[in-house]
Amino acid sequence: MLVIHDRIEPQAEWAAELHLNFEARSKSRLRCFSAENEDVGLFLQRGQSPLRDGEFLQAQDGRVVRVCARPEKLMHVTCSSTFELTRAAYHLGNRHVALQVGDGWLRLLDDYVLKAMLDQLGATVETIEAPFQPEHGAYGGGHHHSRAGEEDFNYPPRMHQFGVRK
């Protein structure tokens, strides 16, 4: 098994490639197969951004591995005006949808409920097969309810925390 722990700077040459969809690139722990059909175990540092197309990893045995975003079924969204596209992005953002933003278009994973919403908003939705590279997010850490790392966020008590008085 090819065991991988480290992300590295871009390299001119590599020994293997991993062709992964967005969900697989978002995991820090993953068992998969390389394009060369070798068993691979990813053990990356937790809490990091998803792997990106063209990123490089180093295996324990020293080999360099290139990450490739595998094409997947996406919705390609366009609108007749910038306002309508912005409105579509706003509504998708309210649903915490992973979203790839381009010049005059949006892309998201195929979902019939979101397609119905976009249709109601007047967007043009086309189903395509393409690599998915969504925005990582403004705060980088993702949305979670874990208490891990809580000491980094020392906020004053809120009004509705029972038993807390000023």
Swiss-Prot record:
Superkingdom of the source species: Bacteria
CDD domains attached to this UniProt entry: UreE (cd00571)
GO molecular function, one term: unfolded protein binding
Keywords on record: Chaperone, Cytoplasm, Nickel, Nickel insertion
Broad class of the protein's primary localization: cytoplasm
Gene Ontology annotations for the cellular component aspect, listed alphabetically: cytoplasm
GO biological process: protein folding; protein-containing complex assembly; urea metabolic process
Entries under Pfam families matching the protein: UreE_C (PF05194), UreE_N (PF02814)
Ranges where the record places region Disordered: 135-154
Locations listed in the record: Cytoplasm
SMART domains on file: UreE_N
Family: Belongs to the UreE family.
Entries under HAMAP family matching the protein: UreE
Annotated function: Involved in urease metallocenter assembly. Binds nickel. Probably functions as a nickel donor during metallocenter assembly.
Protein name (Swiss-Prot/TrEMBL): Urease accessory protein UreE 2
Gene: ureE2
